[in-house]
């Protein structure tokens, strides 16, 4: 399946970054993503099964099953090596794995109660189509949780510092840590290019989702939305 992403080589990039992906998230989030993942899991609420989209190496899914013992998760990602990293890291976790595209999920209609997407929304070339596909597979009143790296408001005192961090420090750290400045530059740019909350929330509404909960983290450096299918 062709990946629903906004760069033709992004699948290869994420494959190459899989061994270092958690370090990348630490850099992009200033080390706060562990706390954010925990907050996200708690806001998702208890369910027997979580469909974790754009799952990466499985840290969010693992956080979820730790917080809700007895639950299981299906991890979906277009990167084979990300899923392989998750299998190797959590060999005993109650996970199943699907390698594929979020806009064409091999999942029955209205078969899921809870889905999540962490740090993946900004990499989608067609978020409208992805949201429509997620809507298709969720049951009535099912929920989709989104955790994404965002930017503080332009009026916020830390806006400029956040921009300087993304523009200069993140690429430098990328070159230092992985010798892949281009990948880190892309990831930093993807945060800056993410549309406004108003735009995204209109997109959610157009896809027949209602925002039931929203939380800004670290002065707006990350945002959690809990969406309900309507």
Swiss-Prot record:
Catalytic activity, reaction form: a 2-demethylmenaquinol + S-adenosyl-L-methionine = a menaquinol + S-adenosyl-L-homocysteine + H(+)
Gene Ontology biological-process entries: menaquinone biosynthetic process; methylation
Positions contributing to S-adenosyl-L-methionine binding: 57, 77, 101-102, 118
Cited Gene3D superfamilies: Vaccinia Virus protein VP39
InterPro entries xrefs: SAM-dependent_MTases_sf, UbiE/COQ5_MeTrFase, UbiE/COQ5_MeTrFase_CS
UniProt keywords, alphabetically: Menaquinone biosynthesis, Methyltransferase, S-adenosyl-L-methionine, Transferase
Molecular function terms, GO-annotated: demethylmenaquinone methyltransferase activity
EC number(s) recorded for this UniProt protein: 2.1.1.163
Source superkingdom: Bacteria
Signal peptide limits: none
Pathway where it operates: Quinol/quinone metabolism; menaquinone biosynthesis; menaquinol from 1,4-dihydroxy-2-naphthoate: step 2/2
NCBIfam families: MenG_MenH_UbiE, PRK00216.1-5
HAMAP family reported in the protein's UniProt record: MenG_UbiE_methyltr (MF_01813)
Family per similarity comment: Belongs to the class I-like SAM-binding methyltransferase superfamily. MenG/UbiE family.
Described purpose of this protein according to its UniProt entry: Methyltransferase required for the conversion of demethylmenaquinol (DMKH2) to menaquinol (MKH2).
Protein name: Demethylmenaquinone methyltransferase
């Amino acid at each position: 399946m062709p990946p629903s992403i906004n760069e033709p080589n992004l699948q290869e990039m994420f494959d190459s970054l899989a061994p270092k992906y958690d370090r990348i998230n630490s850099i992009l989030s200033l080390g706060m993503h562990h706390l954010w993942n925990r907050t996200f899991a708690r806001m998702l609420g208890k369910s027997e099964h979580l469909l974790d989209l754009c799952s990466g190496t499985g840290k969010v899914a693992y956080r979820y099953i730790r917080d809700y013992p007895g639950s299981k998760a299906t991890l979906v990602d277009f990167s084979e090596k990300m899923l392989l990293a998750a299998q190797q890291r959590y060999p005993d976790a109650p996970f199943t794995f699907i390698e594929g595209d979020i806009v064409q999920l091999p999942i029955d209609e209205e078969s899921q109660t809870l889905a999540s997407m962490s740090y993946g929304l900004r990499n989608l070339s067609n978020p409208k189509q992805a949201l429509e596909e997620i809507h298709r597979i969720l049951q009535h009143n099912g929920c989709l949780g989104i955790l994404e790296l965002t930017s503080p408001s332009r009026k916020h005192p830390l806006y400029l510092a956040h921009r300087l961090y993304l523009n200069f420090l993140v690429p430098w750290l990328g070159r230092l840590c992985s010798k892949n400045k281009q990948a880190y530059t892309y990831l930093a740019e993807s945060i800056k290019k993410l549309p406004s909350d108003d735009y995204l929330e209109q997109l959610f509404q157009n896809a027949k989702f209602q925002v039931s909960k929203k939380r800004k983290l670290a002065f707006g450096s990350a945002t959690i939305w809990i969406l309900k299918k309507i």
